[in-house]
């Protein structure tokens, strides 16, 4: 397992600075978010070769989080869905150029989930969207990893069960497991100590889970705290990842734009403490 940081932590920095900061903080890899503020929609991808050289110079592995701000793969607006597809394909191209293997894709959103027919159509739109992305990624040697949501009815897939069913049905689709999101989903489902439930989710995704986001929260908001600053019981989670012989990247996906270096340093230390091998 390689331990790393997400560019989410550094919204005020350039992508080049994100890479340098991550290396300085002891990361072994970095997750680039192919979206604003680091990449404008019309970003000239010829510049990616310089970013690749910088990653190589620091010996960092890389993954890419596909574009998602202001976008929605399940949108009922055709033009928005078309734009989302364009930007996700550009994310896949960026991943290939940077030498990465994983592109993380966000869930779809349905604004009126209580209208059942509308929700079902949003689910179909999301599925068709992924079906369009998969061959594009496959041709470029990139794996699409679908991220679990926080258990809200406005998202699809909203539960780990829905996510697993989706990747079983879509050949080539894999899972990016977000531990903080799983904690929120289990809390919404009525669980108090969510550690064992999250561990069971991980074991249930054996063979599908290829990427992981690690962050903490207090069960109410998606705070993106360093592990230990919230109330997630990480021990069974770590044990479960070891039990399935997880070998992918572990990305600390943290948020503190006012003090990113301090938070990143703390997050990397917590990752090493949790996942260090004897």
Located regions from the model:
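Short, flexible/disordered intra-domain loops and linkers
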Residues: 40-42, 115, 119, 154, ...
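Catalytic-core regions built around general acid/base machinery
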Residues: 46-59, 129-136, 200-204, 236-240
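Active-site-proximal loop/turn and secondary-structure-junction residues that shape catalytic pockets
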Residues: 9-11, 34-36, 68-70, 107-111, ...
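A short acidic, helix-capping loop that chelates divalent metal ions and anchors anionic groups
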Residues: 36-39, 70-75, 111-116, 183-187, ...
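N-terminal pre-domain/capping segments
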Residues: 1-100, 174, 196-197, 268-278
